[in-house]
A protein has these predicted regions:
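Peripheral, non-catalytic segments flanking oxidoreductase cores
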Residues: 1-333
């Protein structure tokens, strides 16, 4: 349902793997090394003891499920996504589709307040939940980015985190809902199927049998373009990653191709915070990451330039290749 990428994830090679788990309450000297190793080998990792209050997470999940449980006509009041707002099946502007409905929000407080009026019957409650969640995950993102910089031996460990705390940061929050498969014999269509995880735990977990393995695309193969993505999902699986840009680390860390499948009889909710720089910010490697022996692989460019290229291409297209340094003059700059 989504255009094939240059290096698609082959279904026959899909294997279950255990992602690295980073305990942020462990010794300060250990976390930077573990994060760098996880980024080099997987591009994904799980974080525990992260400090994001559980009540803030639950409030955000409750508001999300409450919105997606509304009739279609009510949800459409918050759309169409252009790019912000409510979207269903259509992803972006180039014809990509998937079995997903979503809310895309700018993290600017004023924008959240205005959008909430078309999203919720209680705009202040929704706006408060979103703002609290964004503040908490932004603080976590800053901590991870600073640990990452430390693990890379970058002298200025706040070189990345400063970009996402800038008042003009282009960070986003995307709430994704993947409905249950229509052909699942044990599909849960009751109102309780659209409840936060702490409510779902009281429900009977259905056995999907072979239907649960259907590879229907919820959100097709892609790489997140931002600096860092923090993903929270409920207890329903569906994320697949491909083990392989990397501008700010000069190719040392690579943004991993991944996709989401609607392979469950339960509704899947994911909340993704995309930590991004301001539009005017220049994207280039810190001095420690580019040396005469390992010159810059990419020419400097602004985040606005990259976003323009991103919106001109399909979901699975390679965008970073457009910015690769082509000659000695570009590398020297």
């Amino acid at each position: 349902m989504v255009v094939a990428s240059p290096t698609p994830i082959p279904n026959e090679k899909i294997q279950a793997v255990e992602l690295p788990v980073i305990d942020l309450s462990s010794k300060r000297s250990e976390a930077p090394k573990l994060i760098v190793k996880a980024c080099e080998e997987y591009g994904f990792f799980m974080v525990i003891n992260h400090g994001v209050p559980q009540d803030i997470i639950e409030r955000m999940e409750e508001e999300s499920f409450s919105f997606f449980a509304k009739p279609v006509s009510e949800k459409q009041r918050a759309g169409p996504a252009n790019p912000f707002g409510y979207g269903c099946k259509n992803i972006g502007f180039k014809g990509d589709t998937g079995e997903v409905e979503y809310l895309l929000l700018n993290t600017n407080p004023l924008s959240i307040s205005q959008r909430s009026k078309t999203i919720s019957n209680d705009p202040e409650k929704f706006s408060s939940a979103v703002s609290s969640y964004i503040q908490a995950v932004r603080e976590l993102a800053c901590e991870i980015l600073e640990l990452m910089a430390e693990g890379l031996w970058v002298t200025d460990t706040s070189v990345l985190s400063r970009l996402i705390t800038d008042v003009d940061s282009d960070s986003l929050l995307r709430l994704n809902h993947y409905p249950p498969l229509k052909d699942c014999r044990d599909r849960d269509t009751s109102p309780s199927s659209l409840q936060p995880p702490h409510h779902q735990q009281q429900q009977h977990h259905q056995n999907c049998n072979s239907n649960g393995n259907s590879n229907k695309i919820g959100f097709g193969e892609h790489c997140d373009p931002q600096i860092l993505t923090l993903l929270r999902s409920n207890d329903v699986g569906g994320l697949q990653i491909s083990i392989e840009d990397g501008v700010m680390t000069n190719g040392r860390f690579v943004s991993v191709r991944h996709r989401a499948l609607t392979n469950s009889c339960k509704s899947r909710l994911s909340m993704a915070y995309f930590a991004a720089p301001p539009l005017h910010a220049w994207i280039t490697s810190p001095p420690e990451m580019a040396t005469p022996h390992r010159p810059s692989l990419y020419r400097p460019f602004t985040w606005a330039e990259y976003k323009k290229a991103m919106y001109s291409l399909r979901l699975g297209d390679n965008r970073l290749e457009l910015f690769r340094a082509r000659n000695d003059e570009e590398i020297a700059s």
